[in-house]
């Protein structure tokens, strides 16, 4: 750099000329320029590096060079202005930015319509383009300002930019200029209406509005407006644009504003427009009657396009029981749609078919920690939420580490071992497994409904699939579970657990397994804190295999026994499920 930076002292004309002129190729800068301060824009523009950089970076800021697209106009237009309006990239950006927006005000739309009529009318329909442009210009004067930027805005869904502009515009212009002549020719209107098959110009559902009443009306421009708004609602966006073009040349802006507000919503404009024109005598609900296509627009509140049930409807067991993140095509033996107590009864309670695939839930593929924060991360859990009794230390029957992953895997972040009171001896008997599901204040799901004929279903999952047998009482379910749990090595397995020596029979093992596995609440009153948790976590949950668990049988007993010294009989039922543990770890359950 031969010249000094901007903050230096002023230079003489000779040094300035030699520094910025590149060795005398240019004449020296005049003294008036050189006497300016160095930070002045005139002197900065004469510096050699800035001039070279301007030359080199003249077109690097543009993705498309405009001179390759079209010849430059005679007036000196900077490439930035030229590129900002005309390049395909800019048009695409304009189009994308206008997709979800409401329609522009009537003046700007009429401006674009007039531009389209001037441009395309001579090619298509020379005889009719002149009155169209003239009346559109007159309507522009009526409605006030005319923003020039709207001419270049490309609206892909607006029929004003399509091929039939001249006919559409002349139709709307004749509506405004000659009061009743154009509305008395319904064939002309039907000609420029695009969804003519699904949207006839006159409503087919027995409305009292007839051709004679609308054509003989003195304000013919408003006489045809109910049919256009009908057609707009039936035909979606295209009919709506035509309706606005037909209504906007009128001096009274109320129907235009009303129809613009009700673009894709059936019945939103019915009441106000009946007050404005007095001829729209059909109810708004009849707008989507026979012969009309219901307006589907994802941007405006109308009929729902997506077949999702409302948010007040619960979903069946594929969410609550077995996490929609684990779809059944990967888990053929553990089908979430048949997830035992939850799957069968929740689907039955909600009126869903029992074998409905889990993909019917809108959460299929959702990650369980982010969306289903309150659900248990145990893949064998019935899907109840953690009750307040887990954290409050009340008398839940098996309050130990229900979630072996702990806060690292659960978004809820519960402590690893829940505090609990020492249990009463009665709670250790098999009556804990026989307690029927009470009417629960916290769980209003389908499997808690008391009017079900068979409210208890077996949730045993073997290698061949879930059992899913249903029983009327918990005693029958318990006796059925004894057939599952009567394994030859059950007593040896029980001997490994602290405090389990008192249970010397497989029946007691089945009782404990049923109490833990089915998560039945202890035999307390329905409103008591002990029954607040439908999902009572198993005591030695840390002892089962878990890919992220840091402690297994040895440390698990040490963790659970101090908090629950008498809870030994409530061993982990997963020690009996050898084939399930192998399949669960192979399937990547967390």
UniProtKB/Swiss-Prot annotation:
Reported induction: Up-regulated by 17-beta-estradiol.
Record PTM Phosphoserine, positions in chain: 252
Feature: compositional bias, Low complexity: 27-37, 128-139, 171-189, 207-219
A GO CC annotation given for this chain: protein-containing complex
Subcellular location: Nucleus; Cytoplasm
Modification sites for N-acetylserine: 2
PROSITE patterns listed in its UniProt record: ZINC_FINGER_C2H2_2 (PS50157)
Metal-binding keyword on record: yes
GO MF annotations, alphabetized: DNA-binding transcription factor binding; zinc ion binding
Tissues in which the protein is found: Expressed in mammary epithelium.
Subcellular location, principal: nucleus
Keywords: Acetylation, Cytoplasm, Metal-binding, Methylation, Nucleus, Phosphoprotein, Repressor, Transcription, Transcription regulation, Zinc, Zinc-finger
Disordered: region residues: 1-43, 96-293, 341-366
Record field: compositional bias (Polar residues): 1-14
Tagged with keyword Acetylation: yes
GO biological process: adherens junction assembly; cellular response to estradiol stimulus; mammary gland epithelial cell differentiation; negative regulation of DNA-templated transcription; negative regulation of homotypic cell-cell adhesion; positive regulation of cell migration; positive regulation of cell population proliferation; positive regulation of epithelial to mesenchymal transition
Gene3D superfamilies per the UniProt record, alphabetical: Classic Zinc Finger (3.30.160.60)
Assembly behavior: Interacts with TLE4; increases transcriptional repression. Interacts with DCAF7 and PHB2. May interact with HSPD1.
Disease field: Luminal B breast cancers are the clinically more aggressive estrogen receptor-positive tumors. Amplification of a distal 8p12 locus occurs in around one third of the cases and ZNF703 is the single gene within the minimal amplicon. Amplification of the gene correlates with its protein expression in tumor cells. ZNF703 is a classical breast cancer oncogene since it is able to transform non-malignant cells and increase cellular proliferation.
Family in the record: Belongs to the Elbow/Noc family.
Function: Transcriptional corepressor which does not bind directly to DNA and may regulate transcription through recruitment of histone deacetylases to gene promoters. Regulates cell adhesion, migration and proliferation. May be required for segmental gene expression during hindbrain development.
Name recorded for this polypeptide: Zinc finger protein 703
Annotated gene: ZNF703
């Amino acid at each position: 750099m031969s010249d000094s930076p901007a903050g230096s002292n002023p230079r003489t004309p000779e040094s300035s000329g030699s520094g910025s002129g590149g060795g005398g190729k240019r004449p020296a800068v005049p003294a008036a320029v050189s006497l300016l301060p160095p930070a002045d824009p005139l002197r900065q523009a004469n510096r050699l590096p800035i001039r070279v950089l301007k030359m080199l970076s003249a077109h690097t800021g543009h993705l498309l060079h405009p001179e390759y697209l079209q010849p430059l106009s005679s007036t000196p237009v900077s490439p930035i202005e030229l590129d900002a309006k005309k390049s395909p990239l800019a048009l695409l950006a304009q189009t994308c930015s206008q997709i979800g927006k409401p329609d522009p005000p009537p003046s700007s739309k009429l401006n674009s319509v007039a531009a389209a009529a001037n441009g395309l009318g001579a090619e298509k329909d020379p005889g009719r383009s002149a009155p169209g442009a003239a009346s559109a210009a007159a309507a522009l004067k009526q409605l006030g300002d005319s923003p020039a930027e709207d001419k270049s805005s490309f609206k892909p869904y607006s029929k004003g930019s399509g091929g039939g502009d001249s006919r559409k515009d002349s139709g709307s212009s004749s509506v405004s200029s000659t009061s009743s002549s154009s509305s008395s020719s319904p064939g002309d209107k039907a000609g420029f209406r695009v969804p003519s098959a699904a949207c006839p110009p006159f409503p087919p559902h027995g409305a009292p509005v007839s051709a004679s009443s609308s054509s003989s009306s003195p304000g013919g421009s408003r006489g045809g407006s109910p049919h256009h708004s009908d057609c707009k609602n039936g035909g979606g966006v295209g009919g709506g644009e035509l309706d606005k073009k037909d209504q906007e040349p009128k001096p009274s802006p109320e129907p235009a504003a009303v129809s613009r507000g009700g673009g894709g919503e059936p019945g939103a404009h019915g009441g106000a427009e009946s007050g404005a024109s007095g001829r729209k005598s059909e109810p708004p609900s009849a707008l989507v009657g026979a012969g009309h296509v219901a307006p589907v627009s994802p941007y405006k509140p109308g009929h729902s396009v997506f077949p999702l049930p409302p948010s007040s409807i619960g979903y069946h067991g594929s969410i609550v029981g077995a996490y929609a993140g684990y779809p059944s095509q990967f888990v053929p033996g553990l089908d979430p749609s048949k997830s035992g107590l939850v799957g069968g009864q929740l689907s039955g309670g909600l009126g869903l078919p029992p074998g409905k695939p889990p993909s019917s839930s809108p959460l299929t593929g959702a990650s369980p920690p982010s969306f289903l924060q309150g659900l248990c991360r145990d893949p064998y859990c019935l899907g109840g939420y953690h009750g307040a009794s887990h954290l409050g230390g009340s008398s839940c029957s098996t309050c130990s580490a229900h979630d072996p992953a702990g806060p690292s895997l659960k978004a809820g972040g519960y402590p690893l071992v829940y505090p609990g009171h020492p249990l009463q001896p009665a709670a250790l008997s098999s009556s804990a497994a026989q307690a029927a599901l009470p009417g629960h204040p916290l769980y209003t799901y389908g499997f808690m409904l008391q009017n079900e004929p068979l409210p208890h279903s077996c949730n045993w999952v073997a290698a061949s699939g879930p059992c899913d047998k249903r029983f009327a009482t918990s005693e029958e379910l318990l006796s059925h579970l004894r057939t599952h749990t009567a394994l030859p090595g059950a007593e040896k397995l029980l001997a490994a657990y602290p405090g389990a020596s008192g249970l010397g029979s497989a029946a007691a093992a089945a009782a404990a397994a049923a109490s833990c596995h089915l998560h039945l609440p202890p035999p307390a009153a329905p409103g008591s804190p002990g029954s607040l948790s439908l999902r009572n976590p198993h005591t030695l949950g840390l002892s089962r295999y878990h890919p992220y668990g840091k402690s297994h049988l040895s440390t698990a007993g040490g963790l659970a026994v101090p908090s629950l010294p008498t809870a030994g009989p409530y061993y982990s039922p997963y020690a009996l499920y050898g084939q399930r543990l192998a399949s669960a770890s192979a399937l990547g359950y967390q």
